[in-house]
Amino acid sequence: MKKYLAYAVIALIASIGISIAAPDKDAIEAKEKEAWQTFKDKNAEGFKKVVDKDFRGAYAEGISDMAKELSDMKKWDMKSFTISDYTAFSDEKDVMVTTYTVKVEGTVDGKDASGTYNAGSVWKQEKGAWMAIFHTNVKAEK
């Protein structure tokens, strides 16, 4: 009987450890896609649910914060985006670093911005929710 109780305790401890561990790659990738989709849809309220209020971004055109991201959202007419080559890494339970390629079709202020971009984000778990705190992307050279 003691043996079975020991196994039950070990199983319980293992399941607790898994539940507080960093999310898997698929869960973070879904959050990443949600951020892109809300940006594409110009859904500022939805965007703020997955991107932290203290967000920072680094792009070829400059440094960005939440206010600038929301302003830039209005200038975009994104037709589509496709994320590929997605990787996620963490050595902390509440931080994830991602890198990926994203193919975008659309315009910014009427100018074509379509292309393939190399991108990366940093996600932080705050109050049980995963929020993007940093993002960067640069157009890939052919």
Q: What residue ranges belong to the model's regions?
A:
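Hydrophobic pocket/interface hotspot
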Residues: A35, G46-F47, F55, E69, ...
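A mature extracytoplasmic/lumenal domain signature
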Residues: V51, E61-G62, T87, E92, ...
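Short solvent-exposed beta->alpha transition segments
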Residues: K48-T82
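Short, low-complexity N-terminal intrinsically disordered segments enriched in polar/charged residues
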Residues: Y4-V50
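Short beta-strand edge/turn micro-motifs at domain boundaries
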Residues: T116-E141
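Surface-exposed, charged secondary-structure patches
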Residues: S71-A113
